[in-house]
Amino acid sequence: MTRKQAALSTRLKRLGFTQGNQMRLYGEIFEFVSEPIIITDNVVLVDATDKKTGQMRRVRVPLPIVSMAIQGLNAA
């Protein structure tokens, strides 16, 4: 993991994408069971459990949130 990716992961965790947190994404409520998984600078995934079905899924962090996190890194 590069330094930039590590910083992005930390920023996303501060935004709530961390193990044990719940969030509504794509119209569904998920509970995260992993830390952010950075594939590329713009593709970030997180393992999560769908609260409605209990099914485990790998969910993509929405691009606007990733972009906002990257902008926050560039401003700092």
Model-flagged regions — what are they?
Residues 2, 53-76:
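Intrinsically disordered, low-complexity, charged/polar segments
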Residues 19-20, 44:
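Short, hydrophobic/aromatic-rich segments at coil-to-beta transitions
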Residues 23-24:
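Hydrophobic beta-strand signal
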Residues 1-19:
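Mixed-charge, Lys/Arg-rich low-complexity intrinsically disordered regions
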